[in-house]
């Protein structure tokens, strides 16, 4: 197990845990674009043990909470649409 982690980090550049967390956070950004999914829904869907754990990982990776990221993205999207039309 330790050998696998060392090899993985050597070839990928990050630990397996960090790699999987990054994948989950990237996927969560897609799910957060759907207003029908709450942050709690997204957290459990991606296998986080709690919404708090998800929010902490998201904030550490992205720099914003999932809810603030969603709001900022939606505002940016609305702004782009209003400029276009």
Predicted regions and their residues:
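Walker A (P-loop) phosphate-binding loop of ABC-type ATPase nucleotide-binding domains
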Residues: 1
């Amino acid at each position: 197990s330790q050998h696998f982690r060392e090899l993985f980090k050597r070839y990928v550049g990050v630990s397996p845990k960090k790699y999987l967390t990054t994948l989950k956070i990237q996927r969560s950004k897609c799910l957060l674009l759907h207003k029908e999914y709450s942050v709690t829904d997204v957290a459990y869907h991606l296998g986080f043990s709690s919404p708090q754990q998800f929010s902490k990982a998201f904030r550490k990776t992205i720099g914003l909470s999932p809810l603030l990221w969603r709001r900022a993205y939606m505002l940016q999207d609305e702004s782009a649409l209003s400029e276009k039309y």
